[in-house]
Amino acid sequence: MQLQATPEIEELIRQDFIALLAQKLDQVAINGGGSNEPNGILQTSGIGSVVIGTNGGAITLDKMLDLKQTVAVDNADLPTAGFLTNTKVENALSKLKDGNSQYLLSPYGGEIGQQQLANRTFMVSNNVPSNLTKGSSSGVCSAAIYGNFSDLLIGMFGSLELLVDPYTQFQSGGVGIRALQGVDIAVRHAESFGAILDITT
């Protein structure tokens, strides 16, 4: 780009920055650990919890309905609430069938964000962890979240700041660019969310 800049290349790099920042924001909103980053949903004290077993276990529709109930019991189960999990759990759920051999979660149910489970939106992000541990199931457990995501507050402070560093990679002719954006995340009401943390995948 330094040798032959074009508007197309500049726009491509801009889109790369936006995608990277969005990915990080998604990751922290879901599972931020509070160390130099905000606490995400899964690290928020007081959210509902459904346990599958001592060593985790396979996901079932009953457990997903129990997860929904942890929010409903606190009167936070609004029509706009939904499920969020990763593609491993989505794959397992997509294979479950009812007594009439009909899929519980249609594998052809539309675009991401348009599928439904128990009449609620079913969303997927691989930023939902799949490397959790429960008992002897080490590093193979996934999470699933149910909640009213309008109670997940994301505040962005100031505008995106780009800092150019022409020095660090000077000898190779490279230029470093760092993007900075002030962000804070908070769960407005812990009762608006519930999670399963021991789905073996």
Question: What residue ranges belong to the model's regions?
Answer:
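Structured, hydrophobic secondary-structure cores that serve as assembly/anchoring elements
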Residues: 1-201
